[in-house]
C-alpha cells in the first residue's frame, strides 16, 4: 500500500511538471498560438505576392511575344499614334457653378480699406 502512495505522488509531481512546461516553459501553448497566427498571416501575404508575380509574368510574356501589348502601352502611356491616324481628344466641360437663387441673400460686400499715405523723406 505504501508503494502505491509513492507511485501516486511521483505521478502527480510528473503531471504537475508537465503542465508547468506546457503552459509556461519554452515552446508553451501561447507561443505556439502566436506562431500559428504569424504563419497564417505570412501565408496570406505570400498568396497575394504569388498572384502579383503571376500577373507580372503574364505581362512580361505578352510584351515579349506580342506586338499588340506594346502598341497598347505606347498608345495609352506615351500618346503615340500610327502614321496616317488622326488623334482626337475629348475633353469634357467643367461643370458651371450653380447660379445664386433669388431667395438666398447675397454675401456681404466689404468696402476696400483706404490706403494711408506714407511720407518718405
Curated annotation (Swiss-Prot):
Source taxon at top rank: Bacteria
Region of interest called Disordered, as start-end residue ranges on this chain: 92-121
Ranges annotated as biased composition (Pro residues): 96-115
Subcellular location: Cell inner membrane
One of the GO BP terms on file: FtsZ-dependent cytokinesis
Protein name as catalogued: Cell division protein FtsB
Entry keywords, A to Z: Cell cycle, Cell division, Cell inner membrane, Cell membrane, Coiled coil, Membrane, Transmembrane, Transmembrane helix
Family per record: Belongs to the FtsB family.
InterPro entries associated with the record: Cell_div_FtsB, FtsL/DivIC
Job description of the protein: Essential cell division protein. May link together the upstream cell division proteins, which are predominantly cytoplasmic, with the downstream cell division proteins, which are predominantly periplasmic.
Membrane-traversing stretches: 7-24
Chain coiled-coil ranges: 31-66
The keyword Transmembrane appears for this protein: yes
Membrane topology field: Single-pass type II membrane protein
Amino acid at each position: 500500500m505504501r508503494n502505491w502512495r509513492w507511485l501516486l505522488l511521483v505521478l502527480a509531481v510528473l503531471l504537475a511538471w508537465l503542465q508547468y512546461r506546457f503552459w509556461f516553459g519554452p515552446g508553451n501553448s501561447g507561443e505556439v498560438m502566436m506562431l500559428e497566427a504569424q504563419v497564417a498571416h505570412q501565408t496570406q501575404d505570400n498568396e497575394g505576392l504569388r498572384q502579383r508575380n503571376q500577373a507580372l509574368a503574364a505581362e512580361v510574356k505578352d510584351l515579349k511575344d506580342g506586338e499588340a501589348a506594346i502598341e497598347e502601352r505606347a498608345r495609352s502611356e506615351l500618346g503615340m499614334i500610327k502614321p496616317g491616324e488622326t488623334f482626337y481628344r475629348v475633353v469634357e466641360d467643367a461643370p458651371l457653378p450653380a447660379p445664386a437663387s433669388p431667395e438666398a441673400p447675397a454675401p456681404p460686400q466689404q468696402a476696400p480699406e483706404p490706403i494711408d499715405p506714407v511720407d518718405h523723406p
